[in-house]
A protein has these predicted regions:
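Structured loop/turn residues at beta-strand edges in well-structured enzyme cores
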Residues: 1, 42, 104
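N-terminal beta1-alpha1 ligand-phosphate binding loop
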Residues: 2-25
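Surface-exposed, flexible loop/turn segments at secondary-structure boundaries
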Residues: 11, 36-38, 86, 117
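FMN-binding flavodoxin-like domain, especially the glycine-rich phosphate-binding loop
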Residues: 24-27, 55-163
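A short beta-strand-loop structural module common to alpha/beta enzyme folds
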Residues: 27-38, 84
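A short, aliphatic-rich alpha-helical micro-motif
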Residues: 41-42, 73
């Protein structure tokens, strides 16, 4: 089965996660929405969409892609991942940003965690990350959730090879 991994990334975390998926899934293609917008998604059997979360909102390029391709996506095998620093809110982020129809039909949707690196931020985002960092519990870790990523990969592989 042909798999499309389509994503948007602000600081590289979502791209890193998309690359992990691409390396672990056979016959997969990875596309960054900041570079390509007009891929024929109909030729893929599984479509995986990844996005960062900023202040509870998905990337505008992902939102536009989903809106433009909604009728195709609702009839395809899909999976979604988000990268965010506040993993305890991940279900809320999905409920606020994705339709119930898409989530109900998804193979899996999950959070892959995040990275709060101030050096990768720019402008207002840099200021916000500094403020959030100061107000956070010092023991709180913001990191990629390898267990979630591996579980996600296994769920996709089961659909690719059901026997």
């Amino acid at each position: 089965m042909k798999t499309l991994i389509i994503y948007a990334s602000k600081t590289g975390t979502t791209e890193k996660c998309a690359s992990i998926l691409n390396k672990n899934l056979k016959d997969s293609t990875m596309i960054n929405l900041s570079r390509i917008q007009n891929e024929d998604i109909d030729k893929y059997d599984i479509i995986i969409i990844g996005t960062p979360i900023r202040m509870g909102i998905i990337d505008k390029r992902v939102k536009k892609f989903i809106s433009k391709n909604y009728n195709i996506l609702k009839n395809k095998k899909t999976a979604y991942f988000i990268c965010c620093g506040f993993n305890e809110n991940w279900k809320q982020y999905y409920d606020q940003n994705f339709s119930k129809e898409l989530l109900d039909n998804a193979i899996i949707y999950d959070t892959f965690g995040g990275d709060l690196n101030i050096d990768k931020q720019k402008g207002l985002n840099k200021f916000i990350v500094k403020m959030v960092s100061k107000s956070m519990d010092k023991n709180r870790k913001i990191e990629l959730l390898n267990k979630n990523i591996n579980n996600f990969i296994e769920n996709i592989k089961e659909v690719n090879n059901p026997y």
